Amino acid sequence: MAEGGGAEPEEQERRSSRPRPPSARDLQLALAELYEDEMKCKSSKPDRSTATAFKSPRTPPLRLYSGDQEYGGLHIAQPPTGKIVNELFKEAREHGAVPLNEATRSSSDDKAKSFTGGGYRLGSSFYKRSEYIYGENQLQDVQILLRLWSNGFSLDDGELRPYSDPTNAQFLESVKRGEIPLELQRLVHGSQVSLDMEDHQDQEYIKPRLRFKAFSGEGQKLGSLTPEIVSTPSSPEEEDKSILNAAVLIDDSVPTTKIQIRLADGSRLIQRFNSTHRILDVRDFIVQSRPEFATTDFILVTSFPSKELTDESVTLQDADILNTVILQQLK
């Protein structure tokens, strides 16, 4: 009896030391880990159906593209040696940044596209998800350069914007989320924006020297209180098509300026005015050029930052809108 009693606890101990069969919970965890490993392997392989198919002998920059016609497009490019605002680039990368061939940045074969191939349509908010779009839908209208300095950032050749300013912090937060900043959305009604980022973290802001840009086509110089239009028609014929002089009397003895007007329907007008013309003259020009707005109640606002031009008796020079873009908004 004593020996039998001693053997029974040993048998129970051997049974308890045997591995128990896996439960349903164990199987679920194992499958989840297997799935995660498989997805990591897939994500490490280039997908030829997206912009990652564009390769470069060197480490390519990162670029994020948004082709939403309502909110415009957003490109984020980081130079290979970039060390600035690592978190900014990291979070942008998480919202769809893809490597692109550096050569596509300087290609001028197709003026309507900044690169060939697909990109990502970025949501304008948390609720609007990003999605892949194809190259034929990528349009470019306004190109903006965001330079990140050690003491702030600048847009194109504009003034320094300190990081400590809450408005500027909000701008960068939108970029980090892969969204088009609100102040740029106001510029792209019916068109698109290309936003490139340059790394200057090791330098303090350097005010650029004024210079003329020799290129054919249109663009905008952003960053000051109001953007400047940089427009160089490739031929007199094109200039005649883009600038309507019939509706406005020009005094050649007085300085002139070009105003681009983005209409509420998404179209735009470019007109040459004297600096002494008034805001009311701009309104009259819109109505003469587009009679359908004669019975429409609308306002005129500056584009960057947005400010309503309430006093229409003010001259264009006094309103500080020479060589700028103004927007028509329906009431």
Curated annotation (Swiss-Prot):
The modification N-acetylalanine is found at residue 2. Keywords: Acetylation, Cytoplasm, Cytoskeleton, Endoplasmic reticulum, Golgi apparatus, Nucleus, Phosphoprotein. GO terms for cellular component: cytosol; endoplasmic reticulum; Golgi apparatus; nucleus; spindle pole centrosome. The keyword Acetylation applies. Coiled coil: none annotated. Residues 38-48 have a biased composition (Basic and acidic residues). The modification Phosphoserine is found at residues 56, 66, 231, 234-235. Present at high level in brain. Also present in liver, kidney, spleen, testis, lung and heart (at protein level). Disulfide bonds: none annotated. It holds the Pfam family UBX. It comes from the Eukaryota. One of its GO terms (biological process) is establishment of mitotic spindle orientation. The modification Phosphothreonine is found at residue 59. Residues 141-206 form the SEP domain. GO terms for molecular function: ubiquitin binding. Interacts with VCP. Does not bind ubiquitin. Belongs to the NSFL1C family. Adapter protein required for Golgi and endoplasmic reticulum biogenesis. Involved in Golgi and endoplasmic reticulum maintenance during interphase and in their reassembly at the end of mitosis. The complex formed with VCP has membrane fusion activity; membrane fusion activity requires USO1-GOLGA2 tethering and BET1L. VCPIP1 is also required, but not its deubiquitinating activity. Together with NSFL1C/p47, regulates the centrosomal levels of kinase AURKA/Aurora A during mitotic progression by promoting AURKA removal from centrosomes in prophase. PANTHER family: UBX DOMAIN CONTAINING PROTEIN, UBX DOMAIN-CONTAINING PROTEIN 2B. This is UBX domain-containing protein 2B. It comes from Rattus norvegicus.
